[in-house]
Amino acid sequence: MEVAPLVAEVLKRQQVHVTFFAANERTKEGDGSLGDHWAPWWRARAAEGHELASHTWNHTYWRADAGSAPHPAFRVRPSAGPREGQSFVMSAAEYCEEITRAADRLKAISSKTPLPLFRAPGGKTSAQLIASAKACGYAHVGWSPAGFLGDELPSETASNTALLNKALRDVRSGDILLAHLGIWSRKDAWAPAVLEPLIEGLKQRGFCFRTLRDHPDYAAAAAQVR
């Protein structure tokens, strides 16, 4: 969240709306990204017209399926929360609670109902996990291959210039782009350094930007929320 205010400034200046997927991760300031310290930031983004969705409460990574129907379960490893770094088995109902808890907190602090979508940390899923989430009302959203903007990669091997040039070359219409509100391990921060020239460059190529509410793959699910 360290660069979140700068990202918000760029998006506002460029008149671009995005979909934020949020988990309650550790932050340098405050009591987590969905804590009270950052609540005004989320409220302001919702008021500006951005969409919100769940990234699971404890940024919980799926590792493997650990049970099958009619009692699906998953081996998981959260990267936040009281069980950070631990590997354990979570029932489908417990995983749904992970999704719902983040969505409920977003609604509470922003006064805006999140979209019935979620993104699994790392994009790691199984057919069974996706089916279990769908059963409790959430569709999973990944990203396009060209939409992986590389802000998680080491800056020593993936410079901002190289990442910008790759995205400007490869992004196509309909692609879902993925970036973060700061990556602890990256020395040369991707945002906002790359974000604004990327938006400007894609606009010059004739692109416009929409939230997932308007994406053809997710519009039907998003229409459930007004």
Regions found by a protein language model. Give the residues of each.
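C-terminal domain-boundary segment and adjacent tail
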Residues: 13-14, 18, 187-226
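His/Asp/Glu-enriched short active-site or ligand-binding loop at hydrolase and phosphoryl-transfer sites
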Residues: 124-170, 206-218
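Structural recognition of the beta-strand scaffold that forms the well-ordered cores
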Residues: 18-22, 51-56, 116-120, 139-144, ...
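Basic- and aromatic-lined ligand-binding clefts that recognize polyanionic substrates
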Residues: 108-133
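Active-site beta->alpha N-cap acidic-glycine motif
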Residues: 1-90, 94, 98-115, 190, ...
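Short histidine/acidic/glycine/proline-rich micro-motifs that form metal-
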Residues: 24-29, 124, 147, 183-187
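Charged helix-capping and loop-helix junction motifs
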Residues: 34-38, 159-163, 191-195
